[in-house]
């Protein structure tokens, strides 16, 4: 589904590498591709670590313009840092407009006060994720390429 719809490419012509970790750049790029590669609202780049020739340049500018990410601080996006599961679900949650959720305590390892609590509760309610077990989401676990594709597939292909 992801390859056929241009959401992500493999790590080679014949390999997807599902267990390879997903960087912040890859996560935002995959979401941007799934959203149809919309034009960024602004070409103003606030990040010193996102160059104009980076493959993810427009995806990051789009994500910033849509309020999907603010970066890791005011001047850094940290594109090569490994994204965790909480960040990836939060990107998708913000993409859909951060709808209100009623139950923030879906998983035992997601504190109700965590920045990602609403995102995880929304993702569970919408079938985007069923966690890493019936009681855990593992928010700080590295997000793999397979996790990211599964989150996107469960939202966009339903």
Locations of regions flagged by a protein language model:
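The feature marks the first
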Residues: 1-11
């Amino acid at each position: 589904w992801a390859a056929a719809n241009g959401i992500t490419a493999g790590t080679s012509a014949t390999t997807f590498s599902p267990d390879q970790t997903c960087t912040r750049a890859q996560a935002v790029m995959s979401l941007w591709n799934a959203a149809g590669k919309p034009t960024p609202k602004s070409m103003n780049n606030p990040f010193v670590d996102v160059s104009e020739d980076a493959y993810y340049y427009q995806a990051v500018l789009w994500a910033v313009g849509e309020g999907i990410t603010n970066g890791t601080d005011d001047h850094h996006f940290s594109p090569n840092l490994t994204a965790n599961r909480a960040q990836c679900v939060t990107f998708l949650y913000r993409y859909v407009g951060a709808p209100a959720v009623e139950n923030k305590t879906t998983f035992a390892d997601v504190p109700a006060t965590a920045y990602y609590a609403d995102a995880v509760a929304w993702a569970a309610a919408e079938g985007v994720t069923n966690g890493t077990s019936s009681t855990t989401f593992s928010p700080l676990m590295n997000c793999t390429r397979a996790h990211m594709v599964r989150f996107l597939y469960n939202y966009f292909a339903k």
